[in-house]
C-alpha cells in the first residue's frame, strides 16, 4: 500500500480533488477539513473524549484498549460497512486522520483484513493543512489585479469568467454585504482557507499563470476572513473599476437578490416557508445596517420593503423593491464605496463599463 507523504504528493491530492475518507471525530472535521473530504469517523465525539481522558489519566495502552472496547461489535460493523462502501465508491481515494497516526492505521488494517487495500495520508490532516497554508503564501506572491466597482457592477461574474480568476465570495459562500448570505452555511475558517488553497493550486496548475484576477474585497467576507498573506498582497494590487450605468446595476441586483434568492428559498423550503425565509433574509439585511442608516430612515425603508414584498407576493413583480433599493444605493452603498475607493485612488489603473474592463483584463 503506497502512502502519500511528500509536499508534492499533498499538493497533487488537493489539485486532483482526491476523495479523502476522514476518520477524525465530527467535532474535529467541523473545525477544519479538506474540500474533497467526507467524514466517516472511527470514533464519535463522545468516544473520542472518553479515550482522550483515559489517555491523560492511564496512558496510551489503556486508551487504546478503551477505544477498541467502545468501537466493537455492531458499532464496528456499521462503521466498517460505511468505510467499505466509501472505498468502493472512491477507489482512487485515501484515508486521513489528524496526524496519520493510530486512527487511520487502525481503519486501514481493518479494511485490509476485509480484503480492501487503501492508502492513507502520512502526516494526516495536519500535513495537508500545512501544505494548504504554504501554497497560499507562495501563490499569493504572483501579481494581482482587483476588480472594483459599486454594488451591482457584476464584479463577481467578471472574475468567474477569467481563467485566472478566483471567486472569493463563491468560496466563502457569502457575497460580502449585509445582504450577502446564501442558502449554504459558511465553512469554518480553516475549511475556507483549505478550499481557497485548493482552488488557487488548481487554477495555477491549469495554465502558466502570470497574475490573479480577484474581486476587490474587504478583509471579512461574512464570517470568513481572507488569509493575511493574500490580504496584504491585495492591498498593494492594481484595481480595474467597473463603472456601469445605474439602470444596469439595478437590473443585476433585481436578478440576484430578488428573483434568484426568492427562487432559491422556495426551491429549498417550499412555497410557504420559502417565502417567509426570503422575507426574513431581506429584513435581516436591512436591519444589519440600521445604525448607519439612522432609525428614522431605516423605518422608512423597512416600510417600503414591506410594501414591495406585498406587491411581489400578490403580483409576482419585483419592481416595488426599487422604492427602497434605489435610496439604499444612493445614500449608503455608493457613497461608502466611493469613499473607500478614494483612499486607494493611486492604485486604480483602468475604468470602464463591464465589457471594457473584461477586455482589459484579458489583455494583461
From Swiss-Prot:
Domain of life: Bacteria
InterPro entries reported for this sequence: Rhodanese-like_dom (IPR001763), Rhodanese-like_dom_sf (IPR036873), SelU (IPR017582)
Active-site residue list: 97 (s-selanylcysteine intermediate)
Keywords for this protein: Selenium, Transferase
GO MF assignments: transferase activity, transferring alkyl or aryl (other than methyl) groups; tRNA 2-selenouridine synthase activity
GO biological process, one term: tRNA wobble uridine modification
Coiled coil spans: none
Catalytic activity: 5-methylaminomethyl-2-thiouridine(34) in tRNA + selenophosphate + (2E)-geranyl diphosphate + H2O + H(+) = 5-methylaminomethyl-2-selenouridine(34) in tRNA + (2E)-thiogeraniol + phosphate + diphosphate; 5-methylaminomethyl-2-thiouridine(34) in tRNA + (2E)-geranyl diphosphate = 5-methylaminomethyl-S-(2E)-geranyl-thiouridine(34) in tRNA + diphosphate; 5-methylaminomethyl-S-(2E)-geranyl-thiouridine(34) in tRNA + selenophosphate + H(+) = 5-methylaminomethyl-2-(Se-phospho)selenouridine(34) in tRNA + (2E)-thiogeraniol; 5-methylaminomethyl-2-(Se-phospho)selenouridine(34) in tRNA + H2O = 5-methylaminomethyl-2-selenouridine(34) in tRNA + phosphate
Boundaries of every Rhodanese domain copy: 14-137
Signal peptide per UniProt: none
EC number, as in UniProt: 2.9.1.3
SMART domains in the record: RHOD
PROSITE patterns to which the protein is assigned, alphabetical: RHODANESE_3
Bilayer-crossing regions: none
Family stated for the protein in its record: Belongs to the SelU family.
Known function: Involved in the post-transcriptional modification of the uridine at the wobble position (U34) of tRNA(Lys), tRNA(Glu) and tRNA(Gln). Catalyzes the conversion of 2-thiouridine (S2U-RNA) to 2-selenouridine (Se2U-RNA). Acts in a two-step process involving geranylation of 2-thiouridine (S2U) to S-geranyl-2-thiouridine (geS2U) and subsequent selenation of the latter derivative to 2-selenouridine (Se2U) in the tRNA chain.
NCBIfam families for this protein: PRK11784.1-1 (NF008749), PRK11784.1-3 (NF008751), tRNA_sel_U_synt (TIGR03167)
Subunit annotation: Monomer.
Stated name of the protein: tRNA 2-selenouridine synthase
Organism field: Escherichia coli (strain SMS-3-5 / SECEC)
